[in-house]
From Swiss-Prot:
Gene responsible for this protein: rpsP
Lineage, broadest ranks: Bacteria, Bacillati, Bacillota, Bacilli, Lactobacillales
Stated name of the protein: Small ribosomal subunit protein bS16
Species the sequence originates in: Streptococcus pyogenes serotype M1
Entry-linked InterPro entries: Ribosomal_bS16, Ribosomal_bS16_dom_sf
Record flagged with keyword Ribonucleoprotein: yes
Top-rank taxon: Bacteria
Keywords assigned: Ribonucleoprotein, Ribosomal protein
Family: Belongs to the bacterial ribosomal protein bS16 family.
Pfam families named among the record's database cross-references: Ribosomal_S16
Keyword Ribonucleoprotein tagged: yes
GO annotation (BP), single: translation
One GO MF term attached to the UniProt entry: structural constituent of ribosome
Record-level GO cellular component terms: cytoplasm; small ribosomal subunit
Amino acid sequence: MAVKIRLTRMGSKKKPFYRINVADSRAPRDGRFIETVGTYNPLVAENQITIKEDRVLEWLSKGAQPSDTVRNILSKAGVMAKFHDQKFSK
């Protein structure tokens, strides 16, 4: 089972916010997911982001592939740098 970390759209028309979910790559965008690991609100001035870093790092170490947008969000939050250090510190 190929697992991806991607955004799921929530909210109402013209006012979206997103959940950062871990899901099977074959599942629909807003369909079944395994776990919610964060949220992202692009409408707030500072792009409010909440992330469960320990869970994201665990899923990345298990081989989950982040989507391009989620990779950018995680990079801005500093999670990808921690994952890189954790991966190559062995």
